[in-house]
From Swiss-Prot:
The lineage of its organism: Bacteria, Pseudomonadati, Pseudomonadota, Gammaproteobacteria, Alteromonadales. SUPFAM superfamilies: HMA, heavy metal-associated domain (SSF55008). InterPro entries: Heavy-metal-associated_CS (IPR017969), HMA_dom (IPR006121), HMA_dom_sf (IPR036163), MerP (IPR011795). PROSITE patterns: HMA_1, HMA_2. Monomer. It is found in: Periplasm. One of its GO terms (molecular function) is mercury ion transmembrane transporter activity. It comes from Shewanella putrefaciens. Belongs to the MerP family. It comes from the Bacteria. GO terms for cellular component: periplasmic space. Keywords: Mercuric resistance, Mercury, Metal-binding, Periplasm, Plasmid, Signal. This is Mercuric transport protein periplasmic component.
Length: 91
């Protein structure tokens, strides 16, 4: 019985590790004014699973933290593109 309890605990702990938030940086080169980041940030925050989005005009970068079980990088780049600001994953 103890073995079963330990194995169950291990499995549950492993599942939590898989659901860890993921952070990516997107390049958004078409931002051309200081108000553009607000539009990009708002679009990213509407994506399911996004917990944080920080967009900077000076660097033209968006740093996004999201749950990769609920969303994808493709969904993030589509959101910025649909808002008028195409983006790509910064490698």
């Amino acid at each position: 019985m103890k073995t079963l309890a330990l194995m169950s605990l291990f499995v549950l702990t492993s599942l939590n590790a898989l659901a860890a938030p993921k952070t990516v940086t997107l390049e958004v080169p078409t931002m051309n004014c200081v108000t553009c980041p607000f539009t990009v940030e708002k679009a990213l925050q509407k994506v399911d699973g996004v917990s944080k989005a920080e967009v900077t005009f000076k660097t033209k970068l968006a740093v996004v933290t999201f749950d990769d079980e609920k969303s994808t990088v493709k969904a993030l780049t589509e959101a910025t593109t649909n808002a008028g600001y195409p983006s790509t994953l910064k490698e």
